[in-house]
Regions:
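Transmembrane alpha-helices and immediately adjacent membrane-cytoplasm interface residues
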Residues: 37-62, 376-377
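Aromatic-rich juxtamembrane segments at the membrane interface
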Residues: 125-232, 236, 480, 505-514, ...
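Core dinuclear metal-dependent hydrolase active-site scaffold
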Residues: 257, 361-438, 469-530, 538-541, ...
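Cap/insert and terminal regions of metallo-dependent hydrolase folds
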Residues: 519-592
């Protein structure tokens, strides 16, 4: 009973929205009445439901001037003062409990894209919404925690030790083991297994529980460590496995209500339920659960890590135990045998059904879920047009239904980040795009073709188009307009792409100016449902008469957040607003995806906006 109630409480926390929680509560009460016929359970769950509403309700936290360093990550620090947290990016060498004064606080913003990790959203779930890079040290801590960290950081094997003890991720360690805290947990069970041969197990568990709390105090209370401590406490309080799991869920949800979907909590929970309820082929079910979770959370799975998961978990436990004294540790990065896949809703729903059914009774036919990623890739009937959010640069990807063809327009680079390495290639891998049929480089500017040399080394590019007289070889109308034109500069020589699919027409302008727009008006009778606005929304493009003649419904703008050029210009935005053209800008909403199937077309943005395009 308590396990069912705790799972209901967990569902309320996941839903977050108060109205959704109330609706779920009504349906769940009906289920509880049917299952238990006990009004006291009703009352208990109503209390849990109300508690979840309180826990998920947004709280206004006032930013402070001074903070103490409570977390250290690779490339940044987390400062805390009362209930306020801030992300600190600085070259200063800070340690735990150092006190700092901060200035120039601003909201956290990253260039978010579909299927890729969102640093902004990750921090929002930890109630961290602001950042600064202007820091002054007020007081250097001399606490034991600080001195211990500085000592370990100075060791030759510090990268692996810091990853296992502090969760400061290093490329030499597979990320899943640090996120799930398997270094500490495996070490715990190794010690428990050795000591219980001579002493009472309950007493040993109590001692190790105290040690775990002390470890968190002197190192860091990661999500995985907190969950593990709660579970170990539950084993001392309850003899029933379901009650132990229920206690862990309830306590963790109350402490971290916004992080109940973290892999650090979800993965151990699902594996615990498999361990308790699944009676047949438990090893296979565990591997299938890990496979699904890796795809859902990381969009990839290393097959070596998957099949030898238990062996590597124990290995990390041994390294965790002897990390203090071993000076040179081997590189633990596993050989790369990785499958990339970004699950859609179909896979997630099937995974949930598979999991529930396997808890009841495993059947070999459930393994059909393994082929879903491969079928889903080549069975997508939608025409897809993606505008990636790569800062002050351009990159769009056009995918024909069933992966029949892939066209990329531009692959711009960034002075402060390798867009190809960090965004374009991970996106292509997650979409299982292994070749580009046609790459159109609109013109010779770094923010449009700067990534070409890097891209061609990482993926097959069958054809590159840099001239308007070339043809795009696809099975739908695709034209490069105005091959003969009068151009004064590189921007005006931009290739202009015009294509049609499912009765929806697209016009991609590159960096062409108003002069070129006027030449288009006199040369063609153009209509376009969607326009990729010229020159990142600069006022050198987007002539009002030109836009009006197109009869556009949607305008796409690719530009960097708070870029130094002021793109998109107020003038351009005003023109688009006056003409009642719906405008989507990557700096505001992240990457943009447009889908069409026959006469049904819609747009989705990375920040969750959805809209239907009527033609």
């Amino acid at each position: 009973m308590m396990l069912i109630l705790s799972l209901g409480f967990l569902a309320c926390l996941i839903l977050k929205e108060i109205l959704c929680i109330l609706c779920f509560t009504l349906f769940f009460l009906v289920y509880l009445d049917y299952r238990f016929k006990d009004k006291r359970i009703w009352i208990l769950f109503i209390l849990f439901s109300l508690l979840s509403c309180i826990l998920v309700y947004p709280k206004e936290v006032q930013q402070q001037d001074t903070y103490k360093i409570t977390e250290i990550k690779k490339g940044y620090y987390i400062g805390k003062n009362r209930g306020s947290k801030i992300l600190i990016q600085t070259d200063l060498d800070l340690s735990f409990q150092d006190e700092v004064k901060v200035k120039n606080i601003e909201p956290i913003h990253t260039d978010d894209n579909f299927t890729l990790f969102s640093f902004t959203r990750y921090n929002e779930n930890k109630n961290i919404r602001f950042r600064t890079n202007s820091v002054e040290i007020i007081h250097k801590s001399t606490s034991f925690k600080s001195r211990l960290y500085n000592y370990l950081k100075s060791k030759p094997n510090s990268s692996i030790v810091l990853s296992l003890y502090y969760g400061i991720h290093d490329e030499s360690i597979d990320e899943i083991y640090t996120m799930l805290g398997y270094g500490y947990m495996s070490a715990y069970y190794i010690v428990l297994h050795v000591l219980k041969r001579k002493w009472d197990e309950t007493r040993i568990r109590r001692i190790l529980l105290v040690f775990s709390v002390l470890f968190g105090h002197f190192f860091v209370f990661t999500l995985s460590l907190t969950r593990f401590i709660l579970y170990q406490l539950s084993t001392l309080l309850f003899t029933s496995k379901p009650n132990q799991i229920a206690f862990t869920i309830l306590c963790f949800g109350m402490i971290y209500p916004n992080q109940v979907l973290s892999i650090s909590f979800v993965c151990p929970l699902l594996l615990q339920l498999v361990s308790y309820f699944c009676t047949e082929h438990k090893w296979i079910v565990q591997k299938m659960v890990l496979l699904g979770l890796m795809f859902i959370y990381f969009k990839k799975v290393n097959l070596i890590s998957l099949f030898f998961f238990n062996i590597f978990r124990k290995l990390y436990g041994l390294i965790f135990l002897f990390g203090f004294i071993v000076q040179d540790l081997i590189n633990l990065k596993l050989p790369d045998l990785t499958i990339h896949y970004a699950p859609r809703i179909l896979f997630i729903v099937l995974f949930i059904i598979f999991y529930i059914q396997c808890l009841k009774h495993f059947q070999w036919k459930y393994l059909w879920i393994c082929i879903v990623p491969f079928l889903e890739i080549y069975c997508n009937p939608f025409f897809q047009v993606y505008t990636l959010n790569i800062g002050q640069a351009d990159c769009s990807i056009i995918v024909e239904p069933f992966h029949k063809s892939v066209v990329m327009i531009d692959c711009g680079q960034n002075l402060y980040r390798d867009n190809v390495e960090r965004i374009i290639m991970p996106f292509l891998e997650n979409k299982n795009i292994h070749a580009i049929d046609t790459l159109i480089l609109t013109h010779d500017d770094f923010d449009h073709n700067g990534g070409y040399d890097s891209l061609k080394e990482k993926i097959e590019i069958k054809e590159v188009i840099e001239d308007s007289n070339q043809s795009v070889h696809v099975d739908y109308p695709f034209y490069l307009l105005l091959s003969e034109r009068e151009s004064k500069d590189t921007n005006d020589s931009s290739l202009i792409s015009y294509f049609t699919y499912d009765h929806l027409t697209y016009l991609f302008m590159g960096d062409a100016s108003k002069q070129i727009e006027k030449q288009l008006m006199t040369t063609y009778d153009l209509k376009a449902d969607v326009i990729k606005v010229g020159h990142h929304g600069s006022n050198t493009s987007s002539d009002p008469d030109f836009l009006d003649s197109l009869d556009c419904k949607v305008a796409l703008i690719s530009c960097g957040y708070k870029n130094k050029y002021g793109h998109p210009s107020v003038e351009t935005l005003k023109t688009l607003e006056t003409l009642h053209i719906n405008t989507l800008c990557t700096s505001d909403c992240g990457s943009i995806a447009m889908y069409s199937l026959f006469h049904f077309s819609f747009v989705v943005t990375n920040d969750g906006m959805f809209g239907i395009i009527w033609t």
